[in-house]
Regions:
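PP2C/PPM-type serine/threonine phosphatase catalytic domain
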Residues: 1-262
Length: 262
């Protein structure tokens, strides 16, 4: 559960950091979840933040895990179709009668953020209040950090957005910039503690970059900060780097930067 303890592990290029909360602040349980797959050509990551028990987290993780072979097959599609296909597939799972029946039987509900990187693009599907960032020097200069916006009244589980007449979620696709892109996914425990330093994306950008420090150490330092700020909620981080050698889009009045891929 990692109560009063920071645990950071690396799986290939992907770092997962977990912190169960500060016991002296009243932490008793860890209801976060994480799932990552990678094969070198793509990454598939899920981060979850359960409410009122971890049963909904377990349900979502187990449901997606059972679809590994099907999702792996979808990831072989061309870049032009892969994101639409994976989104449609996941939404079909979440909207299936069998999954919705299981949701009715669990205690509590969960926020769920899914991310896929393939080639020089990144796609996400967000239900709830987890956040995903892309940190890059060019984006930093323009104050651009987050891909999604936190939604505080969306969940999967006993209270289920997919039970609504119109399910509510957000999704999107972004082109990654040329060079190093640092992808960071967090649960709200990283943001909502003490002085709430990381509710300001610039602070998280600064603490996840620089000083020739390994990514694993950056993640550890951020979670140590949460501990010292008496974070009561569990906090989870998934992060990895993607070095993009493809040309990125620039405006037409910067011809010196515009390159045409042949």
């Amino acid at each position: 559960m990692c109560l009063d303890e920071v645990s950071v592990k690396q799986y290939g290029d992907i770092v997962i950091g977990k912190y169960g909360g500060n016991i002296s602040a009243g932490a008793k349980k860890n209801e976060d979840g994480a799932l990552v797959w990678s094969n070198g050509d793509w990454e598939f990551a899920v981060i979850l933040d359960g409410h009122n028990s971890a049963e909904s987290v377990d349900l979502v993780v187990n449901t997606i895990q059972k679809e590994y072979e099907n999702i792996k097959a979808i990831m072989k599609e061309s870049i032009k179709t892969v994101f639409r296909s994976v989104e449609n597939y996941i939404l079909t799972i979440f909207q299936s009668p069998s999954f919705k029946e299981k949701c009715e039987r669990v205690k509590g509900e969960t926020a769920c953020l899914i991310c896929v990187r393939k080639e020089n693009y990144i796609w996400w599907l967000s239900i709830g209040d987890c956040l995903i960032y892309v940190f890059h020097e060019e984006l930093h200069k323009l104050g651009q950090y987050t891909l999604n916006q936190r939604q505080f009244y969306e969940w999967i589980g006993n209270v289920n957005t997919f039970d609504l007449p119109i399910p509510c979620y957000s999704s999107g696709i972004r082109e990654l910039r040329t060079g190093k892109n640092r992808i960071v996914m967090v649960t709200d425990g990283v943001l909502e503690c003490g002085e709430r330093r990381y509710e300001t994306p610039l602070n998280l950008y600064n603490d996840m970059n620089g000083n020739n420090v390994e990514l694993k150490e950056h993640v550890h330092n951020v979670l140590e900060h949460v501990h010292h700020q008496f974070g009561r909620d569990s906090a989870t981080i998934i992060s990895w780097d993607y070095e993009n050698d493809a040309y990125a889009t620039y405006p037409s009045d910067q011809p010196e930067k515009i390159k045409v891929k042949k």
